[in-house]
Amino acid sequence: MAEFFATNLWPLLVVIGQSVLLLVILLIAIAYILLADRKIWAAVQIRRGPNVVGPWGLLQSFADLLKFVLKEPTIPDGANKGLFLLAPLVTCVLALAAWAVIPVNAGWVIADINVGVLYILAVSSLSVYGIIMAGWSSNSKYPFLAALRSAAQMVSYEVSIGFVVICVLLCVGSLNLTAIVEAQDGKWGMLGWYWLPLFPMFVVFYVSALAETNRPPFDLVEAESELVAGFMVEYSSTPYLLFMLGEYVAIVTMCAMGTILFLGGWLPPVPYAPFTWVPGIVWFSLKLLFMFFLFAMAKAIVPRYRYDQLMRLGWKVFLPLSLAMVVIVASVLQFADLAPK
């Protein structure tokens, strides 16, 4: 054991330091992305949004954090206390864990593994367990019904996202996220990114990501006019905050996935100066914010689907379309001799 630590202590400390730094940056970014979400929603409704705490309301998210932390958490009588408190922690930790493999610039990744996309899909799939645990452990029928809704919804749209990944995999020949970005690098710039040749799959990914993260118009899990707060109805204080944090981290993760799979990751839109002078992390951040803007606009302007419409869209529209696109992409790559060697 002593020999192991003597050999691996420094690399271990480096990874821990990188993880803590990423965690701090991500949590601060989430605070302002939440504020941006509220501001965009307010602008669509011709309101000002949060504008009291700090200049232009920039400290509103931190005030909300303080409010949640200072509140007393309540646990319902008859609830399974252990699972009730574990559920939000599971949801939040799994959402944060996905960022271990996401490259935000060339070489800027904690774990550059060859199955990065598969890892993200696996971690995002596991988050449904936190929701099921929350609904079941609350010992109330309404959170349990909402948790079942969520499980069915997330499983339905994970299938479509899986076929989207297969299409990109066919074009790249690798599940490594860095390799996917590098495969989109070329003299055509943004016209060579996969959003153009795989545009139907880009649309499928965008809509499926909305459903996967329980965002409007697919927020049937926590529809305010129907279920109040869905599976979170019995939660308050810090556990509720962890659920909210996990939800927004999952949204940003899906935005990052869309950026890497279809928008060229950290690559500049035009591969010539002065665009190449801008650091890759800036391009990645701008593309991620563009994807989040699409998420926020869907929340602001699209009415909520009925549950039967949600399931019909997933199984009767997206699944056949995704399967057809996989066959078409594979056929074109094979007969045009464009398949990666």
Swiss-Prot record:
Enzyme type, top EC level: translocase
EC number: 7.1.1.-
Transmembrane regions: 13-33, 82-102, 115-135, 161-181, 190-210, 248-268, 277-297, 313-333
Xref: InterPro entries: NADH_UbQ_OxRdtase_su1/FPO (IPR001694), NADH_UbQ_OxRdtase_su1_CS (IPR018086)
Protein keywords: Cell inner membrane, Cell membrane, Membrane, NAD, Quinone, Translocase, Transmembrane, Transmembrane helix, Ubiquinone
One GO biological process term: aerobic respiration
Main location: membrane
Domain of life: Bacteria
PANTHER family in UniProt: NADH DEHYDROGENASE SUBUNIT 1 (PTHR11432), NADH-UBIQUINONE OXIDOREDUCTASE CHAIN 1 (PTHR11432:SF3)
Described purpose of this protein according to its UniProt entry: NDH-1 shuttles electrons from NADH, via FMN and iron-sulfur (Fe-S) centers, to quinones in the respiratory chain. The immediate electron acceptor for the enzyme in this species is believed to be ubiquinone. Couples the redox reaction to proton translocation (for every two electrons transferred, four hydrogen ions are translocated across the cytoplasmic membrane), and thus conserves the redox energy in a proton gradient. This subunit may bind ubiquinone.
Family: Belongs to the complex I subunit 1 family.
Protein name: NADH-quinone oxidoreductase subunit H 1
Native organism: Rhodopseudomonas palustris (strain ATCC BAA-98 / CGA009)
Gene name for this UniProt entry: nuoH1
